[in-house]
Amino acid sequence: MNMQESKSIIEVNGVSKFFGEKTALDHVTLNVKKGEFVTILGPSGCGKTTLLRLIAGFQTASEGEIKISGKEITQTPPHKRPVNTVFQKYALFPHLNVYDNIAFGLKLKKMPKQTIEKKVKAALKMVGMTDYEYRDVDSLSGGQQQRVAIARAIVNEPEVLLLDEPLAALDLKMRKDMQMELKEMHKSLGITFVYVTHDQEEALTLSDTIVVMSEGRIQQIGTPIDIYNEPINSFVADFIGESNILNGVMIHDKLVCFCNTEFECVDEGFGENMPVDVVIRPEDLYIFPVSEAAQLTGVVQSSVFKGVHYEMTVLCNGYEFLVQDYHHFEVGALVGLLVKPFDIHIMKKERVCNTFEGKLIDETHVEFLGCNFECAPVTGIEAGSEVKVEVGFDNVILQDNEEDGALTGEVKFILYKGDHYHLTVLSDWDENVFVDTNDVWDDGDRVGITIPPDGIRVIKN
């Protein structure tokens, strides 16, 4: 990449977007280099499409600024920005044929007819639709319509091409074919692509750089290899591919304990006996008949053939491990597992308990999350004082019936930790409550939340 290409063509600085009281984007900062293929990846509702629409100009940022090629364009209307957008639903004009759909923007610019014809034919060639220029768009397949939409976008020679889940409506084979075509197209055009998707495999296949988002914030930015091999937190590790994510304790540098067993690793710089999250990819676990080489022994709980490998669940010391291997082991088989030090990834925990701001009502009552909770007797703190409240993840109890809870909320994120689930519940007070439970809940479940008095720790601010 030369010096010119290494410059940022898109600069998003401290951008937030509010819809009433809802925060769709929370102080997002992102630089996109000229000529890059950048994918913004995340689950539904994470803010990825909102960010794309702000860059395109279809919405306006509530805070912060956006620059393209060094020019501040936060308030600039879409048609005056050097970008074009390809939408999931194509947005083709049904009354125009393929040629006229692609030529539409050029005609608005009042370009000479010969110039328009030359540009349209070049765009059609680029997307492999040379013989389709006079076809009605309604007669085309989904993949062909998507090619026309892309041709219409690139014919204007934008500095940046924005793509909002453009392959989501296609079947699996067509999607994979179009992925490779998009990659080749990006290479040929040399312009900057910013691509939005929730499909992890798509992001890993297409991108120079992946931007992982959750809850309106950027979680991690990196190359596909970096994102996959070195996830920054448990959300990224869980969202990008399959992972075994377990609670562990860093004994000291290069030695970690999880699943009641000590393992050598390559990580260092953590405090002694520090709680950590341990990530092991299923393909990095070796499975074999029990022998002295086994670090763990367990029983195969399930085995499914996936075409190129078997995916097995193995129960070891009360913990479930997902294993991918070319060798097949029957359900019920006693097996050994081994993982090499460089395949164990250690992450600092984002938190070790729930922490809330609160107010001490009296020695046995504290207010937080908009509710008055009974707590164990508090001494040394005056009533009415602002306090910090700590609640262990396993001290939060979820109820099926919302009315049985002191407050209510919605399950937003579920992470399996080998022997329990770690849940993120967005309370109706608009604060996250983190819960460890053996009960099975679904994303989107409405729940009641209770906390027993002995599960609440009140600390003086």
Swiss-Prot record:
Residues 10-240 form the ABC transporter domain. Disulfide bonds: none annotated. Keywords: ATP-binding, Cell inner membrane, Cell membrane, Membrane, Nucleotide-binding, Translocase, Transport. ATP binds at residues 42-49. The keyword Magnesium does not apply. It comes from the Bacteria. Its EC number is 7.6.2.11. It is a peripheral membrane protein. SUPFAM superfamilies: MOP-like, P-loop containing nucleoside triphosphate hydrolases. It is found in: Cell inner membrane. Gene3D superfamilies: 2.40.50.100, P-loop containing nucleotide triphosphate hydrolases. InterPro entries: AAA+_ATPase, ABC_SmlMolc_Importer, ABC_transporter-like_ATP-bd, ABC_transporter-like_CS, Mo/tungstate-bd_C_term_dom, P-loop_NTPase, PotA-like, PotA_ATP-bd. It catalyses: ATP + H2O + polyamine-[polyamine-binding protein]Side 1 = ADP + phosphate + polyamineSide 2 + [polyamine-binding protein]Side 1. GO terms for cellular component: ATP-binding cassette (ABC) transporter complex. Coiled coil: none annotated. GO terms for molecular function: ABC-type putrescine transporter activity; ATP binding; ATP hydrolysis activity. Pfam families: ABC_tran, TOBE_2. The complex is composed of two ATP-binding proteins (PotA), two transmembrane proteins (PotB and PotC) and a solute-binding protein (PotD). PANTHER family: SPERMIDINE/PUTRESCINE IMPORT ATP-BINDING PROTEIN POTA, SPERMIDINE_PUTRESCINE IMPORT ATP-BINDING PROTEIN POTA. Part of the ABC transporter complex PotABCD involved in spermidine/putrescine import. Responsible for energy coupling to the transport system. Belongs to the ABC transporter superfamily. Spermidine/putrescine importer (TC 3.A.1.11.1) family. This is Spermidine/putrescine import ATP-binding protein PotA. The gene is potA.
